[in-house]
């Protein structure tokens, strides 16, 4: 009898349309990610060459070395590009009888200066994190004063017999500062 009563109760009701509320999936929002040692204060400006990088490894010292190496490589690339622009402008504007040999000598000198000056980079930010899987992430930001590069180049030029003949420090400095302002 219990079965019969349930059957009668369920079949005698009025037929109402069943309305289901289907939940819409929540709209995914963009999530801002704050990367350590990054942002405007860590970018190259008219006074400093700057670069930021991250190294990842199961060994903290290797993670740091990776980050430092990559940041130094970025600074070297930026310096080489900037100094090439400076020397091209300087040679074509101020050197008498511009020639490829002068440009080649300036570029060779630049490579030497950059290699030596990179040891003078300064760490302006360093953050170490440990990931859930036990790896280390090291974020670094390095800087090197543009004036240090300019002075090192000027000293090298003054010591080069061929380049020294036509070299005018104040004009070179002016071109260098103009190029640094173009960031």
Spans of model-derived segments:
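Domain-level marker for long, solvent-exposed, non-transmembrane regions
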Residues: 12-183
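Sec-dependent bacterial lipoprotein signal peptides
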Residues: 1-15
């Amino acid at each position: 009898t219990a079965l019969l009563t349930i059957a009668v109760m369920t079949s005698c009701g009025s037929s109402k349309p069943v309305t289901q509320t289907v939940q819409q999936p929540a709209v995914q929002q963009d999530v801002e990610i704050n990367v350590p040692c990054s942002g405007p204060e860590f970018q190259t400006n008219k006074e400093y060459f700057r670069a930021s990088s991250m190294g990842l490894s199961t060994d903290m010292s290797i993670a740091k070395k990776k980050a430092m190496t990559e940041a130094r490589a970025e600074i070297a690339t930026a310096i080489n590009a900037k100094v090439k622009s400076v020397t091209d402008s300087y040679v074509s504007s101020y050197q008498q009888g511009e020639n490829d040999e002068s440009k080649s000598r300036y570029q060779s000198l630049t490579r030497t200066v950059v290699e030596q000056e990179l040891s003078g980079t300064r760490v302006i930010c360093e953050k170490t994190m440990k990931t859930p899987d036990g790896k280390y992430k090291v974020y670094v930001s390095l800087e090197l004063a543009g004036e240090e590069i300019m002075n090192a180049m000027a000293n090298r030029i003054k010591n080069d017999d061929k380049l020294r003949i036509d070299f005018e420090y104040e004009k070179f400095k002016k071109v260098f500062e103009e190029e640094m302002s173009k960031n």
